[in-house]
């Protein structure tokens, strides 16, 4: 299956692919990635524009439970964010979210000279190995909230962020229960740390009288 937003190119690629390709005229940002299930597994490749890459991958990796493998070309800056680890200046909400569902690997850099006309920036090709379903976040809704809240103020200490967070009043208690030092900053936490915080947050919300 091929997703193409432009009607002309969708028709052209359907013609070139003939019986081997099903071209679907749609915007990848509106596609229902939950259609990719273990009973309907997919391998996905794509060349993603800058404004599409982050929101599409946020949706894809969290909803496609049957994704076998993926490879994407993106702007180098986006690739660095996807593959970055704690302590890296590129590490942020997108890094934590995608790495909670898949293992990204930076494969190689593509220079402007590979394109015509050449862009002003480098591109990067990354591969992704989806994590087994039993290793994925139990409460992705809370994980998304935690990482968005934290990385909106990435230079502040976690204790300060938690005290001033009306969206997640349980965050201070969740940090304490997860054993996270409140003087740390978001970019110092691992993916596992953020998942632990979200799990303790879930426990606090589900059992408010016991915590």
Range-by-range predicted roles:
Residues 186-187, 203:
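Short alpha-helix boundary/capping motifs
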Residues 152-155:
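Active-site-proximal catalytic alpha-helix in oxidoreductases
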Residues 136-137, 167-186:
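Short, surface-exposed acidic
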Residues 163-165:
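Short helix-coil junctions and helix-kink-helix linkers
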Residues 1-149, 176, 196-211:
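Catalytic cores of RNA-modifying enzymes
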């Amino acid at each position: 299956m091929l997703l193409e937003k432009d009607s002309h190119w969708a028709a052209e690629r359907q013609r070139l692919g003939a019986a081997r390709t099903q071209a679907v005229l749609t915007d990848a940002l509106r596609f229902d990635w939950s259609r990719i299930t273990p009973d309907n597994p997919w391998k996905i490749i794509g060349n993603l524009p800058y404004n599409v890459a982050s929101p599409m991958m946020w949706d894809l990796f969290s909803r496609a439970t049957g994704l076998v493998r993926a490879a994407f070309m993106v702007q180098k800056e986006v690739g660095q964010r996807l593959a970055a680890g704690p302590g890296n200046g590129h590490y942020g909400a997108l890094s934590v979210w995608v790495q909670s569902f898949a293992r990204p690997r930076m494969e190689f850099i593509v220079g402007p000279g590979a394109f015509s006309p050449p862009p002003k920036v480098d591109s990067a090709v990354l591969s992704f190995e989806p994590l087994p379903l039993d290793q994925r976040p139990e409460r992705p809704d809370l994980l998304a909230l935690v990482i968005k809240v934290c990385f909106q103020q990435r230079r502040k200490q976690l204790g300060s962020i938690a005290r001033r967070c009306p969206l997640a009043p349980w965050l201070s208690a969740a940090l304490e229960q997860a054993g996270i030092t409140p003087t740390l900053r978001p970019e110092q936490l691992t993916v596992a740390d953020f998942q632990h915080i979200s799990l303790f947050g879930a426990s606090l919300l589900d059992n408010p009288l016991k915590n």
